[in-house]
Design a protein with these regions (language model features):
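Nuclease catalytic cores that cleave nucleic-acid phosphodiester bonds
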Residues: 165-294
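Nudix hydrolase/Nudix homology domain
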Residues: 49-52, 98-99, 105-156, 164
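General small-molecule cofactor/ligand-binding pocket signal
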Residues: 89, 126-128, 229, 285
C-alpha cells in the first residue's frame, strides 16, 4: 500500500532522498542462544537504491506517522515483524537533520531472533551477530551510521540500596530482604536489553551484579542473570572496589568483547560521593533509568 510519504524529496543541493516526509528504519536487536546480540538486516533487492547491499528494514514516513510508527510499520511490511514483539529503546537521526529531510533509526529489542517473512524489497533477511556486521557489504548510509548504533558489552554494578530507595515510599524498609529480592527479580526479568549510556552510545546488558549490605544480604536471589556481592561493611566501599578491580567478572559480559568493543563498567547509583570515587572510564547511571525498565 502506498502512503503519502512515498516519493522523492529534493534537498537544497538538488540531491534526491526517498521519503517526502523523511524516512525511518528499525534496528531490531535480539539475544542469540549464547547471549550475544544479533541485529536484523535485509539484503536489498537489486532494483532498489544501492541494491545488493545490507541495511535495516525501513522506508518513507507518512505525514500522519511518528518515526517509531513508520519504522515498525516498515519492518512489518518488509520482514513480517509483529509490532507486539518490539520494545523501542531509543531514536537517532542518522542522516539529514530535523526540520528538513531526515532518516531516523529506531533502536529496539526483541526477546529472541524472530521469524521473518520477506517481501519484494529484499532478497534475504538475516539475523547477524553485531561483531559480523562490519564485514558485510553495507548500504553506504547504514555503514556510516553503524559505529554509533552498535552496542558495547556492559558490566553493570547496582548500588542496590540506592536503587531500592529510589522506588519511593513503598514500605520496602519493613521487609528489606523481601523488597530487595523482588526488585532484583524484576530487573533480571528485563534482561537482556539495549541500554542508552550516559555518553550517548549504546550498551548491551545481559546480566547485573548487585551489591547487598546490612539486612538486605539475606535476600533470596535465584535468577542467573543476577550475581550478588555481599558487603561486610559499606556497600559503597564494595562498589568502589568492584569498579576499580583490575580483573572484572567477565562472566557478566558477552564472550565476544574485543579490543574494538571493550566492556564498559556502569555503576547504577545516585550517590554523589560514590560517583566521585569511581575510576576514570567508569560510567554512572541514575537509578531512575533502571527503574524505567520495570
Amino acid at each position: 500500500m502506498r502512503g503519502d510519504g512515498d516519493g522523492w524529496a529534493v534537498g537544497p543541493d538538488g540531491g534526491r532522498r526517498w521519503g517526502v516526509h523523511g524516512a525511518a528504519g528499525l534496528l531490531l536487536r535480539a539475544p542469540r542462544s549464547d547471549g550475544n546480540p544479533a541485529v536484523l538486516l535485509q539484503l536489498r533487492a537489486v532494483w532498489s537504491h544501492q541494491g545488493g547491499t545490507w541495511a535495516l528494514p525501513g522506508g518513507a514516513r507518512d505525514s500522519h506517522e511518528s518515526t517509531v510508527d513508520a519504522a515498525v510499520r516498515e519492518a512489518h511490511e518488509e520482514a513480517g515483524i509483529d509490532s507486539t514483539s518490539v520494545a523501542v529503546r531509543a531514536e537517532r537521526v542518522t542522516s539529514g537533520k530535523l526540520g528538513s529531510w531526515s532518516y531516523t533509526t529506531v533502536v529496539a529489542d526483541a526477546p529472541a531472533p524472530l521469524d521473518t517473512t520477506m517481501n519484494g524489497e529484499s532478497t534475504e533477511l538475516r539475523w547477524v551477530g553485531e561483531d559480523e556486521v562490519e564485514s558485510m557489504p553495507l548500504h553506504a548510509g547504514f555503514a556510516e551510521a553503524w559505529s554509533a548504533l552498535r552496542t558495547r558489552p556492559v558490566r553493570m554494578l547496582l548500588d542496590t540500596a540506592n536503587v531500592l530507595g529510589a522506588t519511593g515510599p513503598s514500605g520496602w524498609w519493613r521487609d528489606r530482604p523481601g523488597a530487595t529480592g523482588a526488585l532484583l527479580a524484576d530487573i533480571a526479568a528485563a534482561l537482556p536489553r539495549t541500554v542508552e549510556l550516559p555518553d550517548g552510545t549504546f550498551g548491551w546488558v545481559s546480566r547485573v551484579e548487585a551489591v547487598l549490605e546490612g539486612r538486605a544480604r539475606s535476600a533470596i536471589v535465584v535468577d542467573d542473570r543476577t550475581r550478588v556481592h555481599t558487603a561486610d561493611g559499606s556497600g559503597d566501599d564494595e562498589l568502589a572496589r568492584l569498579a576499580a578491580a583490575d580483573t572484572p567478572d567477565t562472566s557478566a559480559v558477552p564472550a565476544t568483547a574485543t579490543a574494538l568493543d571493550p566492556a564498559v563498567t556502569v555503576v547504577v547509583t545516585a550517590d554523589r560521593g560514590l560517583r566521585e570515587r569511581l575510576p576514570h572510564g567508569t560510567m554512572a547511571l541514575s537509578p531512575s533509568a533502571v527503574l524505567g525498565w520495570l
